[in-house]
Amino acid sequence: MLAAISGSYVIPAMYSLSPNPHSTPFQDKVFEDTYDTVLMAIGRRALTEETAVSNAGVKVIPENAKIDSDNEQTNIPNVFAVGDVLHEKPELTPVAVQAGKLLAARLYGNGTTQMDYQNVATTVFTPLEYGCVGLSEEKAEELYGADNLEIYHAYYKPTEFFIPQRNPQRCYLKVVCERAAPQKVLGMHFIGPNAGEVIQGYAAAVKCGLTFETLESTVGIHPTLAEEFTRVTITKRSGEDPTPQSCCS
């Protein structure tokens, strides 16, 4: 659950420093500050203890009570799990639905397709949305090394920002690529109106092996938000200012 609350607040933020998911959350340390917006991400936990999966012999990860599985099959061959209960899998409803459909097809319909948990797109539905697919810049650096990456980025001004002359630095996009040609796209990130709609379309392209060479050769639809990805040329490595210099970014 996510909520943004306007106003000025003094919030005593209390966080558990214990890895035990069943410990009391309000303990150990208190941080206090004043905020103009409070973002509450309540989250959820796996109910494997309440459902007593251990009685069937199913093993769980002690730190989070989740089940470690490659193809939704637990350590007990005839017990399967899908959704948020799986360890290190995206906690998203569409992921659970897709995995469940494919599992049912394999069990009862002679299907062979496994769930692909890589490059799953998602969006945070805040007033200016944030959408992404693929790797973050930090994760890409961890896997590939900073010297082997090229990070394209830009601020942009949506059409609806022109009349009120809103600050273009509220909207931002980033493309994480391999440095070597043809620069395979490893991640795409977008902050702005309708980010979910924009990223949903590019998610299919990323799963198909999108490269930056293909992206920059694509003609955008003007004026749209999604076209900003086809216009980005500035890299972080260059040190150039990514702020738009004209009405068309």
Predicted regions: what is each one?
Residues 1, 5-7, 135-139:
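N-terminal glycine-rich dinucleotide-binding loop that anchors FAD/FMN and/or NAD(P) in oxidoreductases
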Residues 3, 7-32, 38:
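Conserved beta-strand-loop-beta-strand element in the redox core of flavoprotein oxidoreductases
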Residues 9, 59, 147-150:
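Conserved beta-strand segments of alpha/beta enzyme cores
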Residues 18-19, 76, 167-170:
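A short, glycine/Asx- and small/polar-enriched loop/turn
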Residues 33-109, 201:
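FAD-site-proximal beta/loop scaffold in flavoenzymes
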Residues 94-117, 146-148, 206-212:
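Internal hydrophobic alpha-helix adjacent to the cofactor/substrate pocket in enzyme cavities
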Residues 113-129:
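Flexible, acidic loop-helix segments that line cofactor/substrate-binding pockets
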Residues 125-136, 141-249:
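Flexible, glycine-rich terminal cap/loop adjacent to redox cofactors
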